[in-house]
Amino acid sequence: MTESVFETRKLSDIYDEVREVYLSDNRPWILGFSGGKDSTCMVQLVWNAISDLPENQRQKKIYIISSDTLVESPKIVEQITDTLSKMEKAAKEQNLPISTNLVRPEIKDSFWVCLLGLGYPAPSNNFRWCTDRLKIRNADRFIT
């Protein structure tokens, strides 16, 4: 039998830690959401932890952002947009300080402008220009 290198923790302890960190300062939180299992789990942990706080302690704003790279399948974009909309509605109904935002690259940073217009090579493991231009810059623009 293999022992885990990860500390075994109760879910209630994780919720307590999230609440403690949330209440420790007044800086807003920005959570990246892709719709995958990791970001979905993170949003759910934060959501559940903050929901248990009294309403007068839910003062810090939480922004959930997702990147529309403008090259995703329309079904993927529809799924993310629908999920963000449902989160936004539920946050309002539950009086949570959570808002959702879909960020997109500027035209000059879009995949097709870079690939066809500027002659960038197709992204590869050695040259991943698309991650910065299609996701990171948009999140940075939202933050600032």
Predicted feature locations:
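ATP-dependent adenylation/nucleotidyltransferase module used to activate substrates
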Residues: 1-144
